[in-house]
């Protein structure tokens, strides 16, 4: 579970803007406040196609943050960041309405616990055995490419390295 001193602040997204809203939630962990409108502009999100992974990464770079991102991630990768690094993890996954971003805040033996900007309550639980089946989203021109197991971790410590292979931005 993430540190109690730095709880995530839940935020309800505007329609189509789960990416900027998830960034807002994750940034609250670091006591960094940005409006959804500002993050929408930085990510270049739009209601029709949402937010590209690339836009999420560029937005964090523009506010002097760093990003670790990875495709084809595993539940063990999520556990590493939540339990060992004590960092929230943004994931792209497939909800009932389509592809969606949320912030993983905890993991236990049964569930993945999300701070989901589409939900009124601050925690949403998805069965651990179900999550890998829905952990995909659509990216690229007109959302024509499937991205499996994408995750993104924000941090503000220059030069930080993790024990998982992925891309640093």
Labelled PLM ranges:
Residues 1, 43-49, 83-86, 107-169:
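Noncatalytic regulatory segments and standalone regulatory/sensor domains
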Residues 1-49, 95, 108-110, 156-169:
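Active-site-adjacent structural segments surrounding the nucleophilic cysteine of cysteine proteases
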Residues 22-23, 55-56, 113:
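Generic structural signal for hydrophobic residues
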Residues 49-60:
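A glycine-rich, hydrophobic loop/mini-helix early in the fold
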Residues 58-82:
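Helix-adjacent hinge/juxtasegments
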Residues 72-73, 93-94, 116-118:
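Active-site-proximal beta-strand/loop segments in catalytic clefts of secreted hydrolases
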Residues 88-91:
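A short, Trp-centered hydrophobic/proline-enriched beta-strand micro-motif
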Residues 97-102:
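Short, surface-exposed coil-to-beta transition loops
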């Amino acid at each position: 579970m993430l540190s109690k001193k730095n709880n995530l602040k839940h935020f309800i997204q505007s329609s189509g803007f789960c990416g900027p809203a998830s960034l807002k939630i994750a940034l609250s962990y670091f006591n960094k406040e940005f409006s959804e409108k500002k993050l929408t502009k930085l990510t270049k999100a739009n209601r029709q196609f949402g937010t590209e992974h690339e836009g999420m990464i560029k937005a964090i770079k523009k506010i002097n943050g760093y990003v670790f991102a990875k495709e084809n991630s595993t539940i063990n990768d999520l556990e590493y960041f939540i339990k060992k690094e004590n960092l929230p993890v943004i994931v792209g996954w497939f909800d009932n309405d389509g592809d969606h971003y949320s912030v993983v805040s905890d993991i236990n033996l049964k569930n993945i616990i999300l701070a989901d900007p589409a939900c009124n309550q601050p925690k949403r639980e998805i069965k651990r055995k179900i999550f890998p089946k829905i952990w995909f989203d659509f990216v690229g021109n007109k959302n024509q490419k499937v991205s499996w197991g994408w995750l993104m971790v924000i941090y503000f410590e220059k030069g930080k390295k993790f024990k998982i292979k992925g891309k640093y931005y």
